[in-house]
Amino acid sequence: MSVYAIIGGTGLTQLEGLTLSESLPIETPYGAPSAPLQRGRYAGREVLFLARHGHPHRFPPHQVNYRANLWALKQAGAEAVIAVNAVGGIHAAMGTGHLCVPHQLIDYTSGREHTYFAGDIEHVTHIDFSHPYDEPLRQRLIEALRALGLAHSSHGVYACTQGPRLETVAEIARLERDGNDIVGMTGMPEAALARELDLPYACLALVVNPAAGKSAGIITMAEIEQALHDGIGKVREVLARVLAG
């Protein structure tokens, strides 16, 4: 059975129900990961957990050490990665509280350390990234959502923006024209780094706010925090179902 790694995003800095066996403060050639890895059992299965933004939450999206995070998970024995991401909803179907398992992404970030193939290396590898998410792992998430009867979208295009600010109305209009359904700040370079390490990777996205211009008012942190509070239980249900399967 594969050893799953779960990367928890905003609202999931710890995995309730994880029977912790050890905390691993792993050092990597790229520095320290966001937090010590947690190894334990969840839903009867060995799992690794990492809080993407640190525990407590202290790293904004553009300052997360994505290279160290993925490297540490690989070194600790991860064989597949499920990433949990809080996102804004662009498409009308992506209302607050909706869950999405995206099948594609577009990267709008800049200036992030986005590859392991940099510096003094012996050869460059051009990974195929046509389909950024691992399809069998995506299907595991979708099957769990269906079995639980949770409202979800089994496809979607994830726009990854630089942050940490939220987007303008005009920027969201552009993202929508580009074909994006949801918008977040942490999907890249995480997905590409996982591919470079040959780690199957899929995303479970929780919509926590309508994107700019998609509601009458402005977006507030209170609104986002309430949506996280209301929705994170569903995320845990899905993770438990996948791991128990």
Swiss-Prot record:
GO cellular component, one term: cytosol
Positions contributing to substrate binding: 185, 209-211
InterPro entries (UniProt xref): MTAP, Nucleoside_phosphorylase_d, Nucleoside_phosphorylase_sf, Purine_phosphorylase-2_CS
UniProt superkingdom: Bacteria
Pathway: Purine metabolism; purine nucleoside salvage
Site label Important for substrate specificity, positions: 167, 221
Keyword terms of this UniProt record: Glycosyltransferase, Purine salvage, Transferase
Catalytic activity: S-methyl-5'-thioinosine + phosphate = 5-(methylsulfanyl)-alpha-D-ribose 1-phosphate + hypoxanthine
Subunit structure: Homotrimer.
Family statement: Belongs to the PNP/MTAP phosphorylase family. MTAP subfamily.
Pfam families: PNP_UDP_1
Record carries keyword NADP: no
The protein's name in its UniProt record: S-methyl-5'-thioinosine phosphorylase
Entries under SUPFAM superfamilies matching the protein: Purine and uridine phosphorylases
Gene3D superfamilies: Nucleoside phosphorylase domain
Molecular function terms, GO-annotated: S-methyl-5-thioadenosine phosphorylase activity
Record PANTHER family: S-METHYL-5'-THIOADENOSINE PHOSPHORYLASE
Note: Although this enzyme belongs to the family of MTA phosphorylases based on sequence homology, it has been shown that conserved amino acid substitutions in the substrate binding pocket convert the substrate specificity of this enzyme from 6-aminopurines to 6-oxopurines.
Binding site residues for phosphate: 10, 52-53, 186
GO annotation, biological process: L-methionine salvage from methylthioadenosine; purine ribonucleoside salvage
Role according to the record: Catalyzes the reversible phosphorylation of S-methyl-5'-thioinosine (MTI) to hypoxanthine and 5-methylthioribose-1-phosphate. Involved in the breakdown of S-methyl-5'-thioadenosine (MTA), a major by-product of polyamine biosynthesis. Catabolism of (MTA) occurs via deamination to MTI and phosphorolysis to hypoxanthine. Involved in quorum sensing.
Highest classification ranks of the organism: Bacteria, Pseudomonadati, Pseudomonadota, Gammaproteobacteria, Pseudomonadales
E.C. number: 2.4.2.44
